[in-house]
Amino acid sequence: MKVLILACLVALALAREKEQLSVPTEAVGSVSSSEEITHINKQKLETIKHVEQLLREEKLQDKILPFIQSLFPFAERIPYPTLPQNILNLAQLDMLLPLLQPEIMEDPKAKETIIPKHKLMPFLKSPKTVPFVDSQILNLREMKNQHLLLPQLLPFMHQVFQPFPQTPIPYPQALLSLPQSKFMPIVPQVVPYPQRDMPIQALQLFQELLFPTHQGYPVVQPIAPVNV
């Protein structure tokens, strides 16, 4: 009997706990439903307020428009073009700007078609510049010829160049009357020339050493006539 009584008491206690747990769940459900209802009511109030504002703005526009038309009776609305629905969006930069695609930029042929290069004129080398440069540089053959000609010119190297005879320059009286501090003295230029006793062959060898001749240039003539 005692066991039966204990079992009944345990069953009653469990039933009471279940009832207590069911009560807060029902309360939570009722609270959540009430919150949803309040949120819906707030949304309805906001929509009603927005509609009322729109109606007020329309009424104000209806009042202002006739007043403006009375001031400007010939005023008309500015027409604007309607764009078709198949127009490309501005965000599609891949279609509008093919230069930004890396695949196209890697291909050299596509680069040439998209970005044409400016062709430069070829630099034409003038034939006149070549002998001028060659005249500045001595060839090996000419150097060898100079070494061969040096022993032939050794007996004539002791001769000293003689300058032209200096002639006095007459100055006008106006220049002579001025003080010397106002002008610099004029130094006469002295041009050396070889002695007239030098033979023609030695003179030609001497000229070839001083002024090497090349193809395309005339032979340098002596400065003064030579008498044999």
Curated annotation (Swiss-Prot):
It holds the Pfam family Casein. The keyword Glycoprotein does not apply. InterPro entries: Casein, Casein_beta, Casein_CS. Keywords: Milk protein, Phosphoprotein, Secreted, Signal. It is found in: Secreted. It comes from the Eukaryota. Important role in determination of the surface properties of the casein micelles. PANTHER family: BETA CASEIN, BETA-CASEIN. This is Beta-casein. It comes from Oryctolagus cuniculus (Rabbit). The gene is CSN2.
